[in-house]
Amino acid sequence: MEISSKDLSLNEKLKILADAAKYDVACTSSGSSRRGKKEMLGNTEAAGICHSFSSDGRCVSLLKILLSNECIYDCKYCLNRVSNDRVRTTFTPDEICTLVVEFYRRNYIEGLFLSSGIVKSPTYTMELMYQAIYLLRTKYHFNGYIHVKAIPGTSDELITNMGYLVDRMSVNLELPTIDGLKKLAPHKNPKKLVAPIRQIQNGIVDHRLMIGKDASMERSQSNKYLKHTIFQENPYQRIQTGSSPLTLADPSLKNTLRLQNNGKPASFVPAGQSTQMIIGATGESDLQLLSTTQKLYQQYDLKRVFYSAYVPLNEDSNLPALGTAPPLLREHRLYQADWLLRFYGFKADELLSVDRPNFNTMLDPKCDWALRHLDIYPVEINRASYDVLLRVPGIGTKSAFRIVKARKHGTLNFEHLKKMGIVLKRAKYFITCSGKMMYRIPIEEDFITRQLIGEDGKQNWEIDHPQTYRQLSLFDDFNFQSEVTVEDSSKTLFGQM
C-alpha cells in the first residue's frame, strides 16, 4: 500500500519508521570519548551512551529509526521488501534533525542510530542520510553519538564524507555465506557488500596512523596477556577501494570536518565499524557463522559482530514458517562464543569442528568446550597460567587476574576463590586447590553435563521463552495507557507534573 509522505504527520512517520528499525540489532556502547563542547548539544562521554537496555539486551538510549521504509530490493527475509504491501514513508533530513534535537533536549535519547531501505538507488539514499547528519553536526551543533548504516553500492565519496561526521558506521552482511545470500537476496552482490567495509577500514587506519596510533583498533587489556589471540594473525594490509578514504570529495567540508577547532585532524569513524548477521533464516551451522565472524575481526578489524535471531515475517518456501519461534537461545550462545573469541583467546575451529558444527544450546560454549577436553582438567589454581585459567568455566578475565595476583602472596583455597567472584557452581568441576577438588566429583562428561544443564535450566528457558517481543517505546515505556484525569490537567497547569 503506497501512501505519500505528505499524508502523514511527523509523529505517524516516527511510529512507522521506528517500528521498522527494531530488527536491526547493531547498536552498542559508543566507544567514543568526545566531551561536551560549549554551544553544542550532546556528548559521547558523560554517562555512557548505552546505559539503558531492554530485556533482550538491545540498547534503547539511541533514537533508532529508518530514513525510509521504501525499498527497491526484494530480500525474502525483510519486512520492508518491495513486494510487501505496507505503508511507505520517508523522513526529510530536516525532520530527522528536528526529532533528534527535540528528543535529546527532553533527555529521551543520547544519540542517533540511522539506517534505511533503498530509495531509488543506494547513492540517492546515502545522500539523504548524509544531508541529515551534516545538518545535525553543523547547523544544529549536535555533538552526541551517531551510528549510521552505510549503504552498499553507494559512491566512495559519500562514505568517506560520512565517516568524518559519525562515531560508528556499519554495513550489514546479512548472511554468513554466499549461498545463503544467493538464496534469500539474489540481487545483492557479495563483493559490493564487502567493498564499503574495506573502505571504512582503510579510512580508520589512515587516520590512526596520521595521529601516531597503531593501525589496529584497541582491544581488551586481557588480550595483551594472552599468548595467542585471533587479533595476532592476519596483520592489516591496505587494499585500495577507489579514492583514498582521507580525500574529501566535497571541498566545503575542509574546515568543518577534516580539522577540529584546535587544528588537529578530525576523527574518522572513531568508534570503529560493526556488522550484523541473521541466524536461523538459512541452514548455516554455528561453525560457519563463527568462522565468518573470526575472519571479519581479523581481516577488517571490526569492533563488533552482531547476531539477529530471525523472526519469521514473510511467507516464503525458503524461510521458516510464520509462527516459528526465533532461535533466541542460539543467538545467546553465539554472543557468548563471540566473547570467547574477543577476550579469551579462543578460535572458531577450537570451539567447533566439522564433526560437531553446532553448540549444545543447553550449555554455554565455554562449558561445552571444557567437556570435550576433560583430559586437561582438573586445573590446579595455584599453578595454572593466565591462559589456562581463562579456559576454566566460571573464571572470567578479571577473576583470572585476581588469582594470578593473589597467589603471589599465598596459597589459595576455595573460600578465597568465592570471595574473588569465581562462579564455583561451574568451576568446581574443573579445578583443584592444592591438589584437592571442592567435593569428590567424577570427571565424566555425562555426569558433569547433567549437573551443569540442571543448574542453568531455568535461565536457558527464560532466554528461549521471553515475553512478547516489543521494541521499547519512547512514549510509553511500560506499554499501558490511561485516560488523562481532571487532576492531571490541574497539576500540569500549575507546574506540578
Where are these regions (language model features)?
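Conserved, mostly hydrophobic/aromatic
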Residues: 62, 75, 114, 171, ...
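Conserved AdoMet/S-adenosylmethionine-binding subsite of the radical SAM
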Residues: 97, 120-351
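Flexible, acidic/Gly-rich N-terminal and inter-domain linker regions that tether
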Residues: 1-70, 423, 431, 439-497
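Long, highly charged, low-complexity intrinsically disordered interaction regions
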Residues: 320-390, 426-477
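Canonical Radical SAM [4Fe-4S] cluster-binding loop centered on the CxxxCxxC motif
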Residues: 65-94
